[in-house]
Amino acid sequence: MKSVSVIGGGLAGCEAAYVIAESGIHVNLFEMKPGKHSPAHKTDDLCELVCSNSLRSDKLDNAVGLLKEELRRMNSLVMRIADETRVPAGGALAVDRTDFSKRITEELKKHPNIELISREITEIPTEPAVIATGPLTDGALMGNIENLLEDSLHFFDAAAPIVTLESLDMNRISRASRYGRGSDYLNCPMTMREYYDFVRALVSAETAPLHEFETVNVFEGCMPVEVMAKRGDLTLAYGPLKPVGLAECTASDGKKPFAVVQLRQDNSEGTLFNIVGFQTNLRFGEQKRVFGMIPGLANAEYVRYGVMHRNSFLQSPKHLTPFYSLREREDLFFAGQLTGVEGYVESASSGLAAGINLARLVNNRPQIDFTRRTAIGALAHYVSEYNGSSFQPMNANFGIMETLPNAPRDKRRRFEALSQRALQTVDSIAAKLKQQEK
């Protein structure tokens, strides 16, 4: 049996390993845990979600919702397990992060074509491989990648705290989703005075040191709440704390809230909640003090404080093809946030595309280009063909997809039309792959 290596047991690596194994090729899946953990990882399981438990929108008029549906139609392992471990989150797909990781780990361990090897890899493999070691790649392996490619980039990422439901004062909190879409979120309404007092405390709170890193380059999609607050007194009120779509929510003065902090369910039992949009680099003691000013959180018990860590990514447009293979070496693929895709689902998407194409290369079949008509392909073409002045990580969005001729002027209808075309393209690719397997 033919054999390849996949380095890294995150979303991209696990998706790549699964799709390669499903094609009948033996996979050595290398993961450094449990022997070694990165600064952001806490468990020994694969596919650990370190930032949020939300995979974001599940609607087809949203690009990440489209990306999820494309992955489902490509028999994605990550999406199947995400759907099976989902927790209430309104129009979004959120998962029980513990169950999600455990289920992925179990699926891969029992696959007859996958051997899970707990070992840190420091050298670039000489055999066909996917490197999906994630944005925290460092040490000897990162040094060898930089030597091979002669460059890399980095930015900083942050995670939000998680609190226990039983420690919250539910007399100050209401359950509802925005615009009447269920009761999945906990809402902490603030008066104007409470909001401004909170912002003043937040911007003056002490942050944790970043040690050797002097210049902080923060990714907009995971901006620390204290950095947002320093952009202006009303930035949070018009951002993650916007008080819209919550008609039944009232502040302590009996009036419409000036701002609302939302908490999202983090496990299937509904005993843990994360503070939405509150990625942070505050010292742990400062988090307890400042976030304790949020109505209902005065005595909150934190099972995980927010953390901030360095993320690395490659100058992918110089080095990668739209198949995620290295221009300089066709049997070496990269996947995940290391390539410049940003987000859980986006990482899984790159792993799926890289895995499909490595398997096809090993089996002497032509590569599959998902094209910019699909969200999967648009991300692949973005990281491999970006020609602007400053390459930065990118989430799924309709702006990087191929435009639609005679598109509807209404934005929602236009996005839905783009999604329908994308799904037709993905269905055609899936059918072609299935036919070739026979």
Can you say where each PLM-predicted feature lies in the sequence?
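Predominantly flavin-linked oxidoreductase catalytic cores and closely associated redox partners
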Residues: K110-E269, F273-F284, K288-R289
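Internal hydrophobic alpha-helix adjacent to the cofactor/substrate pocket in enzyme cavities
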Residues: S347-I368
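A glycine-rich dinucleotide-binding beta-alpha-beta segment and adjacent secondary-structure elements
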Residues: I275-V341, A348-S349, I368-S384, P393-N395, ...
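Beta1/beta-strand and adjacent pyrophosphate-binding region of the FAD-binding site
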Residues: M1-A12
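Redox-cofactor binding/interface segments in oxidoreductases and associated redox assembly factors
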Residues: I7, V130-A132, F334
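A conserved beta-strand/loop capping segment in the N-terminal third of enzymes
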Residues: D58-T105, K109
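N-terminal FAD cofactor-binding segment of flavoenzymes
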Residues: Y18-R80, R372-V383
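C-terminal auxiliary extensions adjacent to catalytic cores
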Residues: P393-K438
